Amino acid sequence: YCVHCDGALYRNKAVAVIGYGNGAARAVLYLANIASRVHLISPKEKLVAEPVYLERIKSLTNYAATFGAQIAEIRGEEFVESVEFNVGGTPRSLKVEGVFVEMGMKPNVELAENLGLDMTSGGFVKINRLNQETSMPGVFAAGDMTGGRMQAATAVGAGASAGISALQYLG
């Protein structure tokens, strides 16, 4: 689930955030204002995030964390009911109604790199944001590979814009 898109659906419910970096820290802080309980489940041995996030998390009263966890399964019939994981080989179960995965991601830009398209310093495809065109005339890009919000809704809009631009390019 998307924290900002779906977080409000979990008002006064227990949720889990699976992750380890700034994204997980921001998700915990955001959800702590909505959910009854926020449990961070991390494969790392500690939360590695900006100090300002770590300080704010320390003051939360509805937060708990489990580190060094290996996620085994998310269970539920029609809705999420629990997260199953292992810590040091010991199986554990946590009852939650929502799960937000914040493990970080890196879009696959291999084809763009192979084509020789210009890339940003962050490793994304460099585009003209007005028409989604890349550094190669007639080649357009959209979605996570171009950076930005990393949201499905914005990717759909950018994809539509890229499609229209491609049609205009083709005449």
Regions found by a protein language model. Give the residues of each.
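Glycine-rich dinucleotide-binding loop and its adjacent helix/turn
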Residues: 1-22, 26-34, 125-129
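FAD-site-proximal beta/loop scaffold in flavoenzymes
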Residues: 1-9, 103-151, 161
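Cofactor-binding loop segments of dinucleotide-utilizing enzymes, especially the Rossmann-like FAD-
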Residues: 20, 43, 144
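A conserved FAD-binding loop/helix module that cradles the flavin
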Residues: 25-29, 142-171
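A Rossmann-like FAD-binding core segment of flavoenzymes
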Residues: 32-129, 170-171
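Phosphate-coordination loops involved in phosphoryl transfer and adenosine-cofactor binding
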Residues: 11-13, 68, 136
